[in-house]
C-alpha cells in the first residue's frame, strides 16, 4: 500500500469499467488524502468516516453514473475514525460488520498508503487484494513488503482473514528505461502466478483524465491508448475473479 503506485487510478478505472459492463459497483475512498473524492469533486455527509463514528445511520451513496456508486472517505475525519477503531472492542472486524448490509454487487476500496487499524479492518472485509506496482526500485521493494505484511496478518488472524492476493498489476511502466524492464522481469520471476499479463504504460491520457475529473473511459470518449490498456487489464482482473470464485465454490468457501 505504498504511495505513488497509482492505486487510485487503478481503483477508479476498474470500478468505471465494471459499471460500463452494466454491473453494480461501489467505490469506497478510505484514504485521508481523499484522491478519489478530489477526482470526482463529490462529497456527502454519508461518508466512511461518519459511518465508522456513528454520525450517520443509513447508507446513502453518491451515484456517479449508471451502476457506478461512490462512498467518500470524509477526508481528514478519517483520521479520527481510524483512532476510534483502535479503541473498539471489535478492533479488526468492526468495518466488516458495519459494511455487511451493502447490496451493491462489487465493492472496490481505494486504500491509504500506510498500515493502520483501518487497513487491517479492510483486509478483514475484502475478498481480494490487488497490489499495484510502479516499475522502479521503491515500487519493487514496496511490493515485497506488502506481500509479507498480508501473509503475516493472515497468520495472526488465525483464519479470520479470508482475503487473498488476486494479483500484482504494473500500473506505471516506462518503456524507455532498462530499469523498468528489469523490475518487470524480477516481479515475474518472484511471483509468476500472481502477475497480470496486461500492464499500464505511462501515457499522457492517464495523467490528464483525473485533472478533468473523469475516469479513463470517459476522458476523450475512451478513445485513448490509456483506455485501451486499462480495458485489457480490467478484463483480465474480472476473468481472474471469476476463476477464483469458481474455485471457492468448488471448495465450499463462501465469497
Which residue stretches match the model-derived regions?
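P-loop NTP-binding core
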Residues: 1-255
